[in-house]
């Protein structure tokens, strides 16, 4: 068997590995601010704002101009396409603002979930057409890493083998295209929390999905040291009758990861999956407190679980800007502590304890 072509050069590999390690340096995680125009519209509507370019720009500016010390807890921020090319009130491009503060810039590159023919309502993710050209342009424009989300559902008949294999291969094709263009790929095979499944079922499905994903990454010659994984935590379904303790979620999650994710992967950045802000932090903390060998950084890539309280504090009013930024800093610090197993819950505000679950969530 001959080696694959074109192979990454040693310099390309070093750049990718360095980027991945910087993003998940000790105590740091990712702020996912890559909500689509439609999803941002839903967020803005909740606080009585119209979904306009300027409202979206102002909100992202609020996030990105939070005190520079946030870099102690945030290693990377994922942008949406329009955000890559927006500027502050003072004319500073958001990309420059973030990078000048030592935070790496990511970009969402998938084009959303579409139906997968031959399955019972399952999907695959589109966006491979033209991906190489887009990645090359994003790299020129300052991006360091990319994100691509695939979605799988748990039901009596899903995920099907077809869905698991198809989504694994799509993620692998995306990952190798990113690496050829100097971007670290975040590989995100999200198993939705919708349903009434128990913890064992979620763990079993998570293991099968991750095993297939890493088989595909190997088949496509992806350089694992220059990747990050963004998985779901292993939890019961949102409609499940029984609740679970954080220690149970932590053990099921870590067991699934230890069985499937190679130690070459530098970091695992969990998605919050509709958990409340506080639950997402408590579960991350519990995972990191487990006394088992953990060969990767275990940290966060949260969107809703970093921003829900921020949006409420802001309420669309400029006079609330500082209060909203203080809330972002607080949640970032909490999750930074949780990524080291050092978070001590002190009770939560009403917003932090609210479930952020959205059925069949789409970005």
Curated annotation (Swiss-Prot):
EC number(s) from the headed UniProt entry: 4.1.2.13
InterPro entries per record: Aldolase_I_AS, Aldolase_TIM, FBA_I
Pathway of action: Carbohydrate degradation; glycolysis; D-glyceraldehyde 3-phosphate and glycerone phosphate from D-glucose: step 4/4
Tissue expression: Expressed mainly in the skeletal muscle, heart muscle, brain, and some other tissues, but probably not in liver.
Catalytic activity: beta-D-fructose 1,6-bisphosphate = D-glyceraldehyde 3-phosphate + dihydroxyacetone phosphate
Enzyme class at the top of the EC tree: lyase
Record-linked Gene3D superfamilies: Aldolase class I (3.20.20.70)
Gene Ontology biological process: glycolytic process
SUPFAM superfamilies for the chain: Aldolase
The protein's name in its UniProt record: Fructose-bisphosphate aldolase, muscle type
């Amino acid at each position: 068997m001959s080696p694959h072509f074109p192979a990454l050069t040693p310099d390309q590999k070093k750049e990718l590995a360095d980027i991945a390690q910087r993003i998940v340096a000790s105590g740091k995680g990712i702020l996912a601010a890559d909500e689509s125009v439609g999803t941002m519209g839903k967020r803005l509507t909740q606080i009585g704002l119209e979904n306009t370019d300027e409202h979206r720009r102002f909100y992202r500016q609020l996030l990105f101009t939070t005190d520079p010390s946030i870099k102690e807890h945030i290693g990377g921020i994922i942008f949406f396409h329009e955000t890559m090319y927006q500027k502050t009130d003072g004319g500073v491009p958001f990309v420059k603002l973030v990078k000048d503060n030592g935070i790496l810039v990511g970009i969402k590159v998938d084009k959303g979930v579409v139906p997968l023919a031959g399955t019972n309502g399952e999907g695959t993710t589109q966006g491979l057409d033209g991906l190489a050209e887009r990645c090359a342009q994003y790299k020129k424009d300052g991006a360091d890493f990319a994100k691509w989300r695939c979605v799988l559902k748990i039901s009596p008949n899903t995920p099907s083998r077809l869905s698991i294999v198809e989504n694994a291969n799509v993620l692998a094709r995306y990952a190798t295209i990113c690496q050829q263009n100097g971007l670290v790929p975040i590989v995100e095979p999200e198993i939705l929390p919708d349903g009434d499944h128990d913890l064992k079922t979620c763990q079993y499905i998570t293991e099968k999905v991750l095993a297939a994903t890493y088989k595909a990454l190997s088949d496509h010659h992806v350089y694992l040291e220059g990747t990050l994984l963004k998985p779901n935590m292993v939890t019961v379904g949102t409609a499940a009758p029984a609740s679970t303790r954080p220690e149970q979620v932590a053990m099921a999650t870590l067991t699934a990861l230890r069985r499937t994710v190679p130690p070459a992967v530098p970091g695992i950045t969990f998605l919050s999956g509709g958990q409340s802000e506080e639950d997402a932090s408590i579960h991350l903390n519990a995972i990191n407190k487990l006394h088992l060998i953990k060969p990767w950084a275990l940290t966060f890539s949260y969107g809703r679980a970093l921003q829900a309280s921020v949006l409420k504090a802001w309420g669309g009013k400029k006079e609330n800007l500082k209060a909203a930024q203080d809330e972002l800093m607080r949640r970032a610090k909490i999750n930074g502590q949780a990524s080291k197993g050092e978070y001590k819950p002190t009770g939560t505000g009403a917003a932090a304890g609210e479930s952020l679950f959205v059925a069949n969530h789409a970005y």
